[in-house]
């Protein structure tokens, strides 16, 4: 940022600043959610600036550690409502501690309030002694124009149950053990399994589709019956929310934020060996479980973000 850019920014105004390194999809879940949130706010006529904080902009949302913190520090000033959206704990989620969570706590010192994405995330931060300023929980959501159920549900009859799982990250904690077990042990005469995204694994019987942009991903999700959420210690899986948003009940690992996101819209499991029974039960209860799905509407989530940013 040049000095002239900085001086020019002091004279401007937007309704809200967002600090996050945005990427075109396909990309990670936090990026997907923030793209949807920004689009919802813009649809409402709220003016948003990205990675700058003009002199008369009254509020700023900054995301986890995915931005230039030194830039934010330079722009920050008294009188701006600062809200920090926090993921993780990152060390638990990734399976190793590289100091990122400590850095997030340091960055959090600028915040007037902190948004965490699940009760699990809030409680896990507290358990680890990671104190965040004025925390509140707001689940993520999805863009309903893209991730919505199909118009009609055809009865399965004797067809195989179509199971899908997705992941942008190829971290093994995204469910690699579960997928390996399914590839070797599941009855593929009764089930078909699709993985969409990035993986380091080679499968013999699971179909693999590369990373997809949002619309083709949603179309692929709607061509299936059940979503498999096998990631471990995932605070608020956007992949899971996208599957639920497309009307797919979930078979979910009882870990992280999965149970609070799914509720009665799926069946939990603790080990891969339980999945054949879970899939069989979901097949029998498909209509009932689909009807129980609840994803917080994007409009409601945006309202809660705005409330936090305006207090």
Give residue ranges: language-model regions.
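Short hydrophobic beta-strand element within catalytic cores of glycosyltransferases
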Residues: 245, 249-252
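Short alpha-helical donor nucleotide-sugar binding micro-motif in glycosyltransferases
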Residues: 108, 219-224
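Conserved donor-binding/catalytic core segment of Leloir-type glycosyltransferases
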Residues: 154-174, 180-184
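A charged, aromatic-enriched C-terminal amphipathic alpha-helix characteristic of glycosyltransferases
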Residues: 152, 284-311
